[in-house]
Amino acid sequence: MAVNVYSTSVTSDNLSRHDMLAWINESLQLNLTKIEQLCSGAAYCQFMDMLFPGSIALKKVKFQAKLEHEYIQNFKILQAGFKRMGVDKIIPVDKLVKGKFQDNFEFVQWFKKFFDANYDGKEYDPVAARQGQETAVAPSLVAPALSKPKKPLGSSTAAPQRPIATQRTTAAPKAGPGMVRKNPGVGNGDDEAAELMQQVKVLKLTVEDLEKERDFYFGKLRNIELICQENEGENDPVLQRIVDILYATDEGFVIPDEGGPQEEQEEY
């Protein structure tokens, strides 16, 4: 069973973000560049496999996860490993999967202390354990949806406006008989770019609204799940029925890996 670590205070033993990334990359032979990339949960799953072989169904971990429901699936695998090894830590999944620096940095600081308290120094080949898989580069929850239009060169909404403005200012000083014919083309390009930018804004607002609605209901389901876990030893048939409904819903939602949720359902 695992040695639990409860201290969350900031001390001189805490690593900086750069040192933390160096430790993770060296230990797991990864190439993470940002703390935010830990939001996929894959690195934590492999660390658990390193600490407690067999505690994690590593073959089911999605190291190339790029979507939030894939992150959640990885954290469900991690939660199952925590439960199996008697780890008391509650994983703030709903916060971690957002990919925000502060939430992920706080959790990895705790995990580093947990790792140090449980690591026995045995040899471990991380690349062979994950069958050569590498983590996805810079996972983002919103950027992939916004980067689909091909005309804007950057992922942000402001970036495409700058070259457009440059085209206007450079065209004005060169106004003359040879250049007047090209102005309509530039104007059409501006109109097309403006229309694409408007579409991007609409899509972004739609995504944000859907994420808020999803997070609202996910938070409620997560709270219900925690209550059920806290009282799971009471053998209450009502609680068991609630748990069955919760995980049946998850199984139907996470379509990409039909085998994973069923096994985790038994572990919970």
UniProtKB/Swiss-Prot annotation:
Entry comment describing in which tissues the protein is expressed: Expressed within the midpiece of sperm tail (at protein level).
Residues bearing the modification Phosphoserine: S155
Cell wall biogenesis/degradation keyword on record: no
Keywords in alphabetical order: Acetylation, Cell cycle, Cell division, Cytoplasm, Cytoskeleton, Microtubule, Mitosis, Phosphoprotein
GO cellular component: cell projection; cell projection membrane; centrosome; ciliary basal body; cortical microtubule cytoskeleton; focal adhesion; Golgi apparatus; microtubule
N6-crotonyllysine: modified positions: K66
Modified residues (N6-acetyllysine): K220
DCTN1-binding: annotated segments: 208-268
Keyword Transferase (UniProt): no
Interaction with APC: annotated segments: 206-211
Location of the region described as Disordered in the Swiss-Prot/TrEMBL record: 146-180
Region (Interaction with MTUS2/TIP150): 124-268
Modified residues annotated as Phosphotyrosine in this record: Y124
Region (Interaction with SKA1): 232-255
Annotated SUPFAM superfamilies: Calponin-homology domain, CH-domain, EB1 dimerisation domain-like
Subunit structure: Homodimer. Heterodimer with MAPRE3. Interacts (via C-terminal residues 206-211) with APC (via C-terminal residues 2674-2845); the interaction inhibits association with and bundling of F-actin. Interacts with DCTN1, DIAPH1 and DIAPH2. Interacts with DCTN2, TERF1 and dynein intermediate chain. Interacts with CLASP2, DST, KIF2C and STIM1; probably required for their targeting to the growing microtubule plus ends. Interacts with MTUS2; interaction is direct and probably targets MTUS2 to microtubules.
Entry's family note: Belongs to the MAPRE family.
Domain text: Composed of two functionally independent domains. The N-terminal domain forms a hydrophobic cleft involved in microtubule binding and the C-terminal is involved in the formation of mutually exclusive complexes with APC and DCTN1.
Function: Plus-end tracking protein (+TIP) that binds to the plus-end of microtubules and regulates the dynamics of the microtubule cytoskeleton. Recruits other +TIP proteins to microtubules by binding to a conserved Ser-X-Leu-Pro (SXLP) motif in their polypeptide chains. Promotes cytoplasmic microtubule nucleation and elongation. Involved in mitotic spindle positioning by stabilizing microtubules and promoting dynamic connection between astral microtubules and the cortex during mitotic chromosome segregation.
Protein name: Microtubule-associated protein RP/EB family member 1
Organism of this sequence: Mus musculus
Source species taxonomy: Eukaryota, Metazoa, Chordata, Craniata, Vertebrata
